[in-house]
């Protein structure tokens, strides 16, 4: 948070609403050296309701790690003593291609009893949205799963979470991310929207 206070809200997968550079990029010790990246960009900060016109992203050296460290500079300051070298304050969920790992290849996979009350409340809306996305009407029950990947899957009365397809599981992960933002909006008074990044969103969107 920009004022240094902790924001302890979690997604329905039990993670923080943020994504680190290492989830998106792998920097080379040989070629990605300090000073070799100099990016300037502009973004609208919904929290401050202002455009940040001159944000800079550069690579810097670090004594405690072999790779260069990406740092954002020239962010907005609340007062003169604030540090402008900070990331933009905005809730974010990133779903990588790891979400498409087949259930049979996951070392751990089981039902998850966390957030049962919330999932019970949204189960009808979750199921309807899932069926609409996959073009099916057989989905009737939501099961939250845990293990190698956190997910929530919709299945019918004649099979359970053990037998769902990659498409059903992938759709469940996407919906769980969307409903995570809905839950955050209900609980966080300073909510101003969020960002959902999905790597190759069309991959795996098939019902069986």
Regions found by a protein language model. Give the residues of each.
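P-loop NTPase switch/coupling surface
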Residues: 1-103, 114-118
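Extended helical coiled-coil dimerization/tether regions that scaffold
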Residues: 91-195
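Walker B catalytic acidic pair
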Residues: 199-201
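ABC ATPase nucleotide-binding domain "signature" loop
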Residues: 203-205
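Contiguous mid-protein beta-loop-alpha structural module that forms a pocket-lining wall or clamp
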Residues: 208
């Amino acid at each position: 948070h920009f004022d240094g206070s902790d924001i302890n809200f979690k997604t329905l997968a039990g993670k923080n609403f943020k994504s680190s550079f290492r989830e998106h990029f792998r920097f080379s010790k040989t070629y990605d050296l300090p000073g070799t990246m100099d990016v300037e960009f502009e973004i609208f900060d919904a929290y401050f309701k202002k455009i940040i016109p001159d944000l800079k992203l550069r690579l810097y050296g670090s004594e405690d790690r072999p790779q260069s460290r990406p740092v954002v500079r020239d962010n907005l300051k609340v007062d003169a003593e604030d540090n402008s070298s900070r990331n933009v304050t905005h809730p974010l969920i990133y779903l990588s291609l790891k979400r498409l790992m087949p259930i049979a290849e996951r070392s751990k996979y089981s039902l998850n009893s966390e957030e049962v009350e919330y999932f019970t409340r949204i189960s009808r809306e979750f199921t309807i949205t899932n069926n609409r996305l996959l073009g099916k009407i057989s989905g009737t029950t939501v099961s939250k799963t845990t293990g190698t990947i956190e997910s929530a899957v919709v299945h019918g009365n004649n099979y359970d979470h053990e037998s769902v397809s990659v498409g059903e599981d992938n759709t469940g992960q996407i919906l769980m991310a969307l409903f995570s933002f809905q839950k955050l909006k209900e609980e966080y008074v300073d909510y101003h929207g969020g960002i959902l990044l999905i790597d190759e969103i069309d991959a795996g969107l098939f019902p069986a």
